[in-house]
């Protein structure tokens, strides 16, 4: 009865929206929830997972910030969710689906932000050039394999959260680091069986809801990163490009407001999620300016050295232990690794570099540093 009421409410959505009754389904079949839609159920599974919980202790941009008000990875995710749901509600899209994709889009991010991602990718490539670390792919791996789901049914063990295809696709297709991209469309020709072959930064999402999250991912961080840089005394408001101020405003709130209104005006009742050329180019210019003034600053370079040393050091010693696994070895390093391997249920033929990559990617900043210090007796 209650589920029927929820599904009836979905009929009020735009014809362009994704409807949960039309989902391409889960990898393993399940009985539907008596109250929630499939997408709402997915959002709850992500929200209550330990992997999501750890995002509050992972870097967005500024590592080991002294201020309590510097943005963390979890805050960024919640900002993306809030902005995306507002847009989705106005466009008549499925808010439950948007909510789930937004909550899960960074759940597999490495510690130390994008620096950690680059270093971890470099480490694994030195061992196995065929492997790589990209946070959007790893986020899919987290929800498909590494997340622990509490269930009395053995069939769901080692199968992650068993999310719907639309949510999984939105997660793996969310990467919005193509700065020239401000027009997105839903690719309904995608083959669900090829989700693990999604091309980095090239494939469009399957739903308009995922397109919203992908574009908002950029909208949510550029202005907030400027705020954090000002709080860290890295830049001043006067350093913001005057042309950007005229087009988008001076504060994070003004920038978000300008971009959200523009996106809604240009996307309403269309098969696209897009910004006007003027706002899209202003967003691109702001990202490029942030790259120069913030992300490549000497302050962040110092952060990067710490992150690089920690991840490279962890990978080196953990890989050697994973490659020569000895359950009789009682060292702290070996026992930590064995505990992780047993917890995740890896098969005996699992590549040691994959195990170590999974292990490090799941660490918070503080845990990675503490483990590094413990292993090297610092």
Locate each region found by the language model.
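A glycine- and small-aliphatic-rich helix-loop capping segment at beta-alpha/alpha-beta transitions
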Residues: 113-126
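Short alpha-helical catalytic segment bearing the HExxH-like zincin motif
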Residues: 98-103, 214
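Histidine-centered, transition-metal-coordinating active-site segments
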Residues: 1-77, 81-87, 116, 132, ...
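Short pre-active-site segment immediately N-terminal to the catalytic Zn-binding motif
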Residues: 85-97
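Short hydrophobic "helix-edge" motifs at membrane interfaces and signal-peptide entry regions
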Residues: 94-99, 206-208
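Short active-site segment of divalent metal-dependent hydrolases/proteases
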Residues: 104-112, 220
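Acidic, glycine-rich active-site loops and adjacent beta-strand->loop/helix elements
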Residues: 103-107, 124, 146
């Amino acid at each position: 009865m209650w589920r029927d009421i929820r599904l009836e409410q979905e009929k009020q959505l735009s014809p362009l929206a994704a409807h949960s009754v039309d989902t391409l389904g889960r990898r393993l079949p399940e009985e539907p929830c008596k109250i929630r839609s499939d997408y709402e159920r997915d959002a709850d599974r992500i929200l209550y997972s330990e992997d999501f919980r750890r995002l509050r202790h992972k870097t967005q941009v500024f590592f080991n910030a002294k201020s309590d008000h510097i943005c963390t990875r979890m805050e960024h995710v919640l900002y993306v969710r809030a902005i995306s749901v507002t847009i989705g509600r106005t466009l008549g899209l499925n808010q439950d689906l948007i909510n789930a994709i937004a909550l899960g889009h960074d759940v597999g991010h490495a510690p130390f932000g994008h620096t950690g991602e680059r270093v971890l990718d470099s480490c694994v490539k030195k061992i196995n050039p065929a492997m790589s670390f990209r946070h959007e792919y790893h986020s899919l791996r987290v929800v498909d394999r590494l997340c622990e789901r509490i269930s009395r049914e053995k069939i769901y063990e080692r199968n992650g959260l068993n999310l719907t295809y639309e949510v999984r696709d939105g997660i793996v297709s969310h990467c919005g680091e193509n700065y020239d991209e401000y027009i997105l469309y839903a690719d309904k020709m995608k083959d669900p069986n090829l989700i693990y072959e999604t091309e980095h930064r090239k494939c469009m999402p399957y739903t308009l809801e995922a397109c919203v999250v992908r574009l908002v991912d950029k909208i949510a961080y550029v202005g907030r990163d400027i705020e954090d840089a000002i709080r860290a005394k890295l830049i001043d408001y006067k350093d913001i490009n005057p042309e950007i101020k005229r087009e988008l405003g001076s504060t994070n709130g003004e920038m978000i407001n300008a971009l959200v209104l523009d996106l809604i005006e240009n996307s309403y009742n269309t098969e696209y999620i897009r910004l006007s050329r003027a706002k899209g180019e202003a967003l691109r210019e702001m990202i490029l300016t942030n790259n120069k003034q913030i992300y490549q600053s000497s302050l962040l370079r110092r952060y990067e050295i710490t992150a690089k040393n920690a991840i490279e050091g962890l990978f080196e010693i953990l890989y050697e232990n994973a490659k020569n696994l000895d359950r009789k070895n009682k060292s702290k390093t070996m026992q930590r690794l064995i505990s992780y391997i047993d917890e995740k249920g890896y098969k005996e033929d699992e590549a040691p570099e994959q195990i170590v990559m999974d292990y490090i990617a799941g660490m918070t900043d503080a845990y990675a540093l503490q483990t590094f210090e413990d292993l090297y007796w610092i």
